[in-house]
């Protein structure tokens, strides 16, 4: 079995993404130099025509980061318990969430992307969420989708 030392986990706070983080950490632990990067993409839903000040955007981003810290602490504990280095990054307002994940993986020479099967969108009947499907389609490295 291939050893994946550089693992990227895409997190949105959903249960599948938290499970994906745990599995990504365990997989990375099997390598000699485990390194997991957890990314959370903050995508605001501000309509383009809305006039928003930079301070309003900063406030929204800070709130999103504070909310994410609640579930990121669980991921940090899992990494610490497994002796795996964890780096947490936030990507703010990309044109595409899928492109942000795929580009990050490519730019940082990631060995494996681990992502939850469905996010927080609420489409529970879908077998695979649109973000997971997009990452599977466009990533140049292996992708593990966790249910």
For the regions a protein language model found, what residue spans apply to each?
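Short alpha-helical
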Residues: 15, 96, 122
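Structural beta-alpha unit
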Residues: 2, 77-113
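Small/aliphatic-rich secondary-structure junction motif
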Residues: 2-55, 82
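General small-molecule cofactor/ligand-binding pocket signal
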Residues: 37-39, 87-91, 144
């Amino acid at each position: 079995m291939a050893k994946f030392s550089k693992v990227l986990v895409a997190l949105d706070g959903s249960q599948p993404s938290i499970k994906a983080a745990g599995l990504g950490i365990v997989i990375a632990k099997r390598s000699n130099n485990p390194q997991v990067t957890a990314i959370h993409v903050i995508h605001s839903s501000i309509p383009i025509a809305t006039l928003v000040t930079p301070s309003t955007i900063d406030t929204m981003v800070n709130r999103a980061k504070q909310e994410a810290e609640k579930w990121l602490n669980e991921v940090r504990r899992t990494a610490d318990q497994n002796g795996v280095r964890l780096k947490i990054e936030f990507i703010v307002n990309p044109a595409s969430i899928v492109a942000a994940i795929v580009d990050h993986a490519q730019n940082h020479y990631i060995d494996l992307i681990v992502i939850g099967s469905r996010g927080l969108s609420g489409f529970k009947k879908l077998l695979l969420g649109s973000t997971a499907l997009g990452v599977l389609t466009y990533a140049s490295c292996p992708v593990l989708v966790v249910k």
